[in-house]
Amino acid sequence: MQRQHDGLRAALVAEGVEIVDVGGSLGDVKAVFTRDQAIAVDGGAVICRMGPVGADPGYGRRGEEAYITKVIANLGMPILRTINGTGLIEGGSFCFLTPKVAALGMSFRQNEEGARQLEDVLRASGTRLIRVPLTGHALHIDGAILMVDHRTALVNMARLPYWFLDELKALGIQLVYVWPSEGHAVNCLAVRPGRVIISEGCPRTRERLTAAGVESIEIDYSEIRKNGGGIHCSTLPLVRDRDGGRGTV
């Protein structure tokens, strides 16, 4: 796992990305999935409230919020809201579709109170939030859709309701469908518009991305995928250049 995580880090640096380490003595190996801990929006960050609570000390993800809060505060990035009370949200289930339209995948890791608190923050910048019920035991929306360019999305249609696919088309978003046996391909990372880092083992999906004008960089992430997440899960973009170039994760 460490070797593959180091490989992701090297790929990000090669793309001009500035990396900030969370650090801390996190006890759960799933803490590598920093995407879930916070959400970057216009003007600052929203600190999430994690779903899993460990029965024993050092197990479960509740508590990771404290580490990411310290990191973001030390960077001088405004914290606009901390999801509190009974609210639940994990960042892997949030995505921007356009600058003013976002989606939140609803599952047992997200609830209506969490969605309401996030919506309060987004409303201040004129951003609409679409609640998308996820299928079965799916946890996060990043296993179903990823924006790979300004108006192009990689999607796993088996994990999204039909009406939401129609909504994407109404927003003018071109849909690139993952190859049915390569569902993990969705959990990739756009490092700039039209360029993604993707897991090995997705040749047919990569062909479809290429046909849509999207470049892909392939890395081995198989061991970390066994831990229940992917490349997208392992990164938390904080700032992206307006020109689509370098960013900070």
Language model features with spans:
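The feature marks the mature, well-folded catalytic cores of soluble enzymes
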Residues: 1-249
